[in-house]
């Protein structure tokens, strides 16, 4: 996988263009970006932190891994996929304060 220097606007644009497919195929209600790319602190080896909320009944390992693979291919970068309701309490406030949701 190529490690390209990309920015938050490029990531958001790619996710917005693919948003309908992500929601329909992977049963996602919300998707957003947080972490180093949002803060402008990404390095050449940084992964992209993505926060998701799955539709009820679709939060399973198989769907999670399919979405992770799809996002890594779409964004041409490693993705750290985080399920919103699984965020540890000590990280929740920071993540929710910095997340940029797609549409």
Where are these regions (language model features)?
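Conserved histidines in hydrophobic membrane contexts and catalytic metal-binding motifs
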Residues: 33
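Catalytic core of pol beta-like nucleotidyltransferases
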Residues: 1-30, 38-44, 55-103
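Short hydrophobic/aromatic beta-strand micro-patches
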Residues: 51-53
